[in-house]
């Protein structure tokens, strides 16, 4: 079983406004951030944070997709296992995904709409986050 949590969220703010909050040091983009040269524009961010209750670092990967007047954000958090027999992370991946989205919404001062939320996300459930 994969311990990952996925969110698909519409942030009611322009793409520029959303990517402006992705700065070095933010827990949702402190590993990697890139805006691709595509139309519509797409950005990728990777963050890492230590969770005491999981006893491990977790990562969050985000895909940001430009829309006309809003930005779609896919947040996938995972990595709370310490060994082969760990079958739970005490909700850490869920909390990291939600915390990352909540921070983006607060920093942009935008309203956000959760379109989908997927617990125990794995490749067989990835269709649920497709747009």
Language-model-derived ranges and their functions:
Residues 75-83:
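Short, solvent-exposed aromatic-acidic interface loops
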Residues 129-131:
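Glycine-rich, aromatic-bearing surface loops/beta-hairpins
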């Amino acid at each position: 079983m994969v311990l990952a949590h996925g969110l698909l969220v519409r942030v009611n703010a322009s793409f520029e406004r959303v990517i402006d909050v992705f700065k070095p040091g933010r827990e949702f983009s402190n590993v990697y951030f890139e805006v691709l040269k595509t139309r519509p524009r797409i950005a990728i961010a990777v963050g890492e944070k230590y969770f005491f209750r999981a006893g491990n670092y977790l990562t969050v990967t985000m895909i940001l997709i430009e829309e006309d007047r809003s930005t779609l954000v896919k947040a996938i958090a995972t990595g709370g296992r310490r060994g082969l027999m760990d079958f739970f992370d005490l909700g850490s991946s869920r909390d990291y995904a939600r915390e990352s989205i909540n921070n983006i919404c607060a920093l942009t001062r935008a309203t956000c709409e959760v379109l989908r939320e997927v617990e125990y996300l794995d490749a067989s459930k990835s269709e649920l986050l497709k747009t």
